[in-house]
């Protein structure tokens, strides 16, 4: 396969470097937030923890403000990353997209099939099929960072690109499968607002303020429309102008991405993790762990992800459609495939959408996500550490 040109600009390279660093550190903060949530939820503080999440402010519970509001900012960040990578970064050509693209597709398909197989015949739990289909980029890069600079940058970029494409798949799934009860007037208002945002982009309006104000309005209309409000963040991101490479110093997209990265990595995602990882383990027995939902989620993440990602990558490389990341080998690629089973943030998020109003099933999702992601993190780091220690 021919070598693809590197179209990343110097500032784009700097942003990628900071991105990997902040996501890795943010992943460690997210781990701490998740652990803190588990401790608090199983301590005398649990009553205050859960009552705070369910308390209402301005018509929405604190939990919904986090899941529908703060996570819209997270999805705005995801959208900016996707647009930057596709236009001028590590996904700028079809050759660069090939390996993470095939791997992401396999990594979404196989976990979903495993979950469906385990929950077949149960319409209530079958709606959670997409829960194990996503990779948590912050958590996965955070675990990978524990190996330090022994990990080739190409592997980190592969994992980041795969997770970004995973997020794109998750956004598509949410839009088509987890939006219901549409309010057509509000949906029409959302489309009109989006059309104005597109017009601003076409008119080459480069000031961020008009986009952000209209983005807030778009979020409100989407929230009221029945489509999940976080999709407003992605739609806004796609309207923010990127500009030409020679204009990168004035690129609104790069400027907004730079300003948002640390807030998202060290505030938004950890707050989400703390609010959603808390589950009381007092009523959970070993028998509950093999209930269809936690079993399907855990096996989908731990088994399905590594099989789907690695098998799709192998087939793509063997067929000459992609190449191994530079400086890596098959075992290292397999180790990264295992780490793709860390599905924390997006898996918990989709779990809330799949089982609205069913706290029991949401708690089972949390248990499955924690077990599957934990096993993937431990197995992946053990394999990669043993492999890198030989070099």
Swiss-Prot record:
Transmembrane segments annotated in the record for this chain: 25-45, 56-76, 98-118, 128-148, 157-177, 180-200, 208-228, 264-284, 297-317, 335-355, 364-384
Entry keyword Zinc: no
Compartment annotation: Cell inner membrane
Major subcellular site: membrane
Key words, A-Z: Antiport, Cell inner membrane, Cell membrane, Ion transport, Membrane, Sodium, Sodium transport, Transmembrane, Transmembrane helix, Transport
Gene Ontology terms describing biological process: regulation of pH
Pfam families cross-referenced by the UniProt entry: Na_H_antiport_1
GO cellular component: a single term: plasma membrane
Reactions performed catalytically: Na(+)(in) + 2 H(+)(out) = Na(+)(out) + 2 H(+)(in)
Similarity comment: family membership: Belongs to the NhaA Na(+)/H(+) (TC 2.A.33) antiporter family.
NCBIfam families: NhaA, PRK09560.1, PRK09561.1
PANTHER family attached to this UniProt entry: NA(+)_H(+) ANTIPORTER NHAA (PTHR30341:SF0), SODIUM ION/PROTON ANTIPORTER NHAA-RELATED (PTHR30341)
Protein name: Na(+)/H(+) antiporter NhaA 2
Species assigned in the record: Pseudomonas syringae pv. tomato (strain ATCC BAA-871 / DC3000)
Gene: nhaA2
């Amino acid at each position: 396969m021919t070598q693809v040109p590197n179209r990343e600009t110097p500032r784009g390279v700097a942003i990628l470097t900071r991105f990997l660093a902040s996501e890795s550190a943010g992943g460690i903060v997210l781990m701490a937030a998740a652990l803190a949530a588990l401790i608090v939820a199983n301590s005398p503080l649990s009553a205050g923890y859960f009552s705070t999440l369910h308390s209402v402010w301005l018509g929405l519970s604190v939990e919904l403000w986090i899941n529908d509001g703060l996570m819209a900012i997270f999805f705005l960040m995801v959208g900016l990353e996707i647009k930057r990578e596709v236009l001028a970064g590590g996904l700028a050509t079809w050759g660069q997209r090939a390996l993470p693209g095939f791997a992401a597709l396999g990594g979404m398909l196989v976990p979903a099939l495993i979950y469906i197989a385990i929950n077949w015949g149960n319409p209530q739990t079958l709606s959670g099929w997409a829960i194990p289909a996503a990779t948590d980029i912050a958590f996965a890069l955070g675990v990978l960072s524990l190996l330090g600079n022994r990990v080739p940058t190409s592997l980190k970029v592969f994992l980041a690109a795969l997770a970004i494409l995973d997020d794109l798949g998750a956004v598509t799934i949410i839009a088509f499968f987890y939006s219901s009860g549409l309010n057509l007037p509000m949906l029409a208002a959302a489309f009109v607002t989006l059309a104005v945002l597109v017009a601003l982009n076409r008119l080459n309006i480069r000031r961020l303020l008009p986009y952000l104000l209209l983005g807030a309005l778009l979020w409100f209309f989407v929230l009221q429309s029945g489509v999940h409000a976080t999709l407003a963040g992605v739609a806004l991101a796609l309207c923010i102008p990127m500009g030409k490479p020679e204009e990168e110093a004035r690129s609104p997209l790069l400027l907004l991405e730079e300003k948002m990265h640390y807030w998202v990595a060290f505030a938004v995602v950890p707050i989400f993790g703390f609010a959603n990882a808390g589950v009381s383990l007092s009523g959970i027995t070993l028998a509950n762990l093999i209930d269809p939902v936690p079993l399907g989620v855990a096996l989908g993440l731990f088994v399905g992800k590594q099989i789907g990602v690695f098998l799709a990558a192998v087939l793509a490389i063997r067929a000459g459609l992609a190449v191994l990341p530079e400086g890596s080998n098959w075992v290292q690629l397999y180790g990264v495939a295992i780490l793709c089973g860390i599905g924390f943030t997006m898996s918990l998020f989709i779990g809330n959408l799949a089982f609205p109003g069913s706290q029991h099933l949401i708690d089972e999702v949390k248990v499955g996500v924690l077990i599957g992601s934990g096993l993937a993190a431990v197995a992946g780091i053990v394999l990669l550490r043993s492999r890198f220690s030989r070099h």
